[in-house]
């Protein structure tokens, strides 16, 4: 798959975290956890498309740490998707396996913050594109702040969903329009003296 295809798929799935709250009434024939498993699978799979494109662009650099970081991100997202699939097949399951797999949702968000920082440091994406993965990664600290300010209620959920739809859509658009160009750029790693 080329980056244009990956970006298109990512853009199609990026708003599903937000859309799920509007779409749930139309899927009343599904158990609510099956519904969350369905939209979660679409959302996480779209995110995986963006990360695969970052990998193709070598956005985290060509060093071992940068390459491993994106493989870890893809692995964390795949494990998070396993929890979505469990919700689809066995709604209501609260086994230890589900709890462990479900923990990869927040862990993948936390790891995306590290990915975003690494992309900024490596400076392989030009201009504003360099900061987009960091924008996505900032979802985690924004949610921590919101939970401390507003609790785990509707306000935090709304902020999480809107932030997610905007940031992940910008990431998808960045991937869509960057094409393959960044792969050819020489690394101009930022030096902090």
Residue map of PLM features:
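Hydrophobic, aromatic-enriched alpha-helical segments typical of multi-pass transmembrane helices
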Residues: 1-193
